[in-house]
């Protein structure tokens, strides 16, 4: 059986670490992970088991470093694009920069190796920006969420547009969960019609892997959400603060550097 290699971009984030944990459960000699991060010591502190495994190669540097990202995604089965933020950063470009660099890297690989297999790109997005998936969210709450994460959502929308503009040669899957929580894995189901809060990052990661490994192409080019099968994840206590600080960053972007970093926990 050929070695299956997966690239995880954003390895120090909650989704990135959950993807690595899922892929390493259990470790397999037939699977390898290329983990991109900006800070290798931070990743090793989050996942100290990586010090003792040969299944993971860490790529450290800037997401706009074309040669680094090219090396990270070459000969992979799937690339997980999870570089984003829980903070409503003014002018956020994290997802756009990730997608742009990956697309440029794939073009270089195809030029050098015309017969190279292009990996599936799995983008972490949000149900909030999908009219169909968010249709059952409370009408009073949806605009609050869209405002509290306005800069992040604008970044995601543009990143999705970039991927869809290249769908003639790149297969992308758009994973759109609702609220996320740092919690245990309970079981998941991929869904085209429903969203649910809260989903654990471990269940989200398992869902992303399932979509990436599907050989029938049922998720290719689709917006896909995730629902629980074994009960909801716990309510993240950091959520109210995340929303309030996100609203402040939206209405008063000049306060950004004075405001705390937030996110579910």
Swiss-Prot record:
Physiological role: Oxidoreductase; part of the gene cluster that mediates the biosynthesis of monodictyphenone, a prenyl xanthone derivative. The pathway begins with the synthesis of atrochrysone thioester by the polyketide synthase (PKS) mdpG. The atrochrysone carboxyl ACP thioesterase mdpF then breaks the thioester bond and releases the atrochrysone carboxylic acid from mdpG. The atrochrysone carboxylic acid is then converted to atrochrysone which is further transformed into emodin anthrone. The next step is performed by the anthrone oxygenase mdpH that catalyzes the oxidation of emodinanthrone to emodin.
EC numbers for this chain: 1.-.-.-
InterPro entries attached to this UniProt entry: NAD(P)-bd_dom, NAD(P)-bd_dom_sf
Pathway listed: Secondary metabolite biosynthesis
Leading EC class: oxidoreductase
Annotated GO MF terms: monooxygenase activity
Consequence of gene disruption: Impairs the production of monodictyphenone, but still enables the synthesis of intermediates until emodin. Results in major accumulation of chrysophanol and its 6-hydroxymethyl shunt product aloe-emodin.
Family statement drawn from the similarity comment of this UniProt entry: Belongs to the avfA family.
Record keywords, A-Z: Monooxygenase, Oxidoreductase
UniProt organism field: Emericella nidulans (strain FGSC A4 / ATCC 38163 / CBS 112.46 / NRRL 194 / M139)
GO BP term, example: monodictyphenone biosynthetic process
Stated name of the protein: Oxidoreductase mdpK
């Amino acid at each position: 059986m050929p070695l299956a290699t997966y690239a995880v971009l954003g390895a120090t984030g909650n989704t990135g670490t959950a993807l690595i944990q899922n892929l390493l459960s259990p470790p397999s000699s037939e699977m390898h992970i290329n983990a991109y991060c900006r800070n290798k010591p931070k990743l090793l502190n989050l996942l100290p088991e990586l010090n003792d495994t040969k299944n993971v190669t860490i790529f450290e540097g800037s997401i706009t470093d074309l040669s680094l990202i090219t090396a990270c995604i070459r000969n992979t089965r799937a690339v997980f694009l999870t570089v984003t933020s829980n903070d409503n950063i003014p002018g956020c470009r994290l997802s756009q920069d990730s997608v742009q660099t990956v697309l440029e890297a794939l073009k270089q690989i195809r030029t050098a190796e015309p017969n190279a297999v292009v990996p599936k790109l799995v983008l972490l997005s949000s149900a909030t920006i999908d009219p169909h998936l968010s249709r059952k969210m409370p009408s009073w709450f949806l605009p609050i969420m869209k405002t509290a994460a306005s800069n992040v959502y604008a970044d995601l929308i543009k990143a999705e547009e970039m991927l869809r503009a290249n769908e003639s040669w790149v297969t992308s899957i758009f994973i759109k969960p609702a609220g996320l929580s740092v919690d245990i894995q309970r079981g998941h189901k991929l869904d085209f019609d429903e969203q649910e809060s809260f989903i654990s990052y471990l269940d989200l990661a398992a869902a992303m892997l399932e979509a990436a490994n599907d050989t029938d192409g049922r998720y290719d080019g689709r917006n896909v959400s995730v629902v629980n099968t074994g009960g909801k994840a716990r309510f993240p206590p950091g959520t109210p603060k995340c929303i309030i600080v996100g609203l402040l960053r939206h209405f008063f972007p000049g306060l950004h550097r004075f405001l705390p970093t937030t996110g579910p926990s």
